[in-house]
Regions:
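Active-site-adjacent loop and "lid" segments of alpha/beta metabolic enzymes
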Residues: 3, 9, 24-36, 55-83, ...
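Phosphate/pyrophosphate-binding loops at sites that engage ATP/ADP/AMP, CoA/4′-phosphopantetheine
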Residues: 41-42, 82-83, 159-172
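Catalytic domains of carbohydrate-active enzymes, especially glycoside hydrolases
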Residues: 36-51
Length: 264
């Protein structure tokens, strides 16, 4: 489990989500990117994850230029106050973001692009490798697996092992099973239960306000999914997950504080 700097206690690190996209599924993430990010830092975020391309189911791709216009100014400002992750599938955008101050690449396509893989090696940055079946535009159209846990595990570990074989520090590698990215509800639940299969690498969960929670809780809109998101975070704490990506930083930090206090 990750260690929160300064207090000597262990809990999942909290990564606040900033979606600099006009079609983000969570309304409040796309307004006032810098101000919202700095509020997240004040609320206790350890990382800020900034993305300019929507990867929600059915999302359409955008140009590299448009993606950079959305994210680079925010990365430049926020990286002066907090560690920043760039959420992108494009190696050109990732390189510009690293130059602007980002220190992690969060690639939802799981380093499919060899140039992205090479950039991680050359820069020595932290990286989150996520599993996605298909592409955002079609990934939720009847996804199928023979054994979802084994298939996702093999896919992610092959890439992580290859990074390590090329000299990349293991402590800078996070693996994300990709909840909601080419998975049905049962697939998602199986992957969350089996997250230890991704060890010895650090594990990241990104479940905040996703449709999985809406399906379980009968909450069709994202606004009604905070309680379900916190339930997932409590399970992440119990399972010693290393980092979680969330829209609601303060609520998750408070949750972990209470869980720690109850253990004391």
């Amino acid at each position: 489990m990750a260690v929160l700097e300064g207090d000597g206690k262990t809990r999942p690190l909290v990564m606040g989500i900033i979606n600099a996209t006009p079609d983000s599924f969570h309304e409040s993430s796309r307004k006032g990117g810098v101000a919202r990010a700095l509020k997240m830092v004040d609320d206790g975020a350890n990382w800020i994850d900034i993305g300019g391309e929507s990867t929600r189911p059915g999302a359409k791709s955008i140009s590299i230029e448009e993606e950079m216009e959305r994210v680079i100014p925010i990365v430049t400002e926020v990286s002066q106050h907090c560690r920043v992750s760039i959420d992108t599938r494009n190696h050109i955008v990732a390189k510009k973001a690293l130059e602007a101050g980002a220190s992690m690449i969060n690639d939802v396509s799981g380093l499919r692009d060899q140039k992205m893989f090479d950039l991680v090696i050359e820069s020595g940055c932290s990286v989150c490798i996520m599993h996605m079946q298909g592409e955002p535009g079609n990934m939720q159209k009847n996804p199928k697996y023979t054994n979802v846990v084994e298939e996702v595990r093999e896919n992610l570990l092959e890439k992580a092992d290859r990074l390590v074989d090329n000299g990349h520090p293991i402590e800078k590698i996070y693996l994300d099973p990709g909840i909601g990215f080419g998975k049905l509800l049962q697939h998602n639940l199986e992957l969350l239960r089996a997250s230890d299969s991704l060890r010895p690498y650090s594990v990241m969960w990104g479940v905040s306000r996703k449709s999985m929670i809406g399906d379980i809780c009968n909450q069709p809109t994202t606004e009604g999914r905070l309680a379900g998101s916190l339930a997932v975070a409590a399970k992440a704490y119990e399972k010693k997950i290393d980092m979680i990506r969330v829209h609601d930083v303060r609520e998750h930090v408070d949750l972990f504080s209470v869980l720690e206090a109850m253990e004391d």
